[in-house]
């Protein structure tokens, strides 16, 4: 289970960069996580508009926690935060504060996109490091909101979307492939979705590079409604469990 919540937020999030214009302040998305047949936990994403260093930003907060029987033997309490420049879609500040069993990390990242660098501070030992990055680098949460603000023309079946996501002290290349348009059944009803295959790192968490499938709404919202991942041990499923203040209507049919 170690780092699984970390990667769930990543899989909900991975994308490229663009102006953030498909999000409304006050939005909330909640996901139910299952590990095999077990009710494993919840993940919640909330968005509020703020001013950061004199510029309009979205402050996105992601909270993940284990529940039920899983929490009895593996306690997870994760908090992620990203301050995203609304005009550029790029992250200015990012926090990853996670506790997963005996695994503990608390990092804060300041991005400087003008000179393609960042400063990573380890809040547990109060040390800082500077890194060179690349143009358009994203964090795990900012990439989520860029995905949803991309033009629908980029989501044609067969298209590939490449990206680089900064995780802790390293940049990871990812690619998304749109493979189909499908109707997906959810607790709210059926909805047209884009079926997407993220190509991920095999051998550490996932069985293969193609071990993950995600479905996002085929509309202006691009809300992920389900993610399935085949792990080295077991499988994981994340399903949309609640939503509020989404900018455009979600057209579920009963």
Regions found by a protein language model. Give the residues of each.
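Sec-dependent signal peptide recognition
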Residues: 2-10
